[in-house]
């Protein structure tokens, strides 16, 4: 058994899930608008900077403020769809990781 082949099979399985397809489709749709893509990248960079420069309690407050600043942006249909589908994909992946962990601990 070659683990690399199993990894490729697993990745292909993930690519064929509705969660991945929906996330990818909404990402492509979002990226069609360069301004929205740029705003999303700016938000992500600001969020990452906050998490790397502040303690957790302070970071949480800063993130809440950042999210308020971007609330109109988050409510745009293409952004909202991307965020929703990304959360669904991440949830699916989290469940996969938990299943793998469960199998490893048997």
Model-derived regions: residue spans:
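Terminal, compositionally biased segments used for targeting/anchoring and flexible tails
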Residues: 1-106
């Amino acid at each position: 058994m070659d683990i690399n082949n199993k990894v490729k099979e697993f990745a292909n399985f993930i690519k064929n899930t509705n969660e991945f397809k929906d996330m990818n489709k909404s990402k492509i749709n979002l990226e069609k608008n360069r301004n929205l893509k740029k705003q999303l990248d700016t938000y992500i960079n600001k969020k990452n900077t906050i998490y790397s420069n502040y303690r957790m309690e302070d970071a949480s407050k800063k993130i809440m403020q950042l999210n308020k600043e971007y609330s109109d942006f988050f409510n745009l249909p293409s952004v909202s769809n991307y965020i929703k589908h990304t959360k669904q994909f991440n949830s699916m992946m989290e469940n996969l990781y938990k299943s793998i962990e469960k199998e490893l601990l048997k």
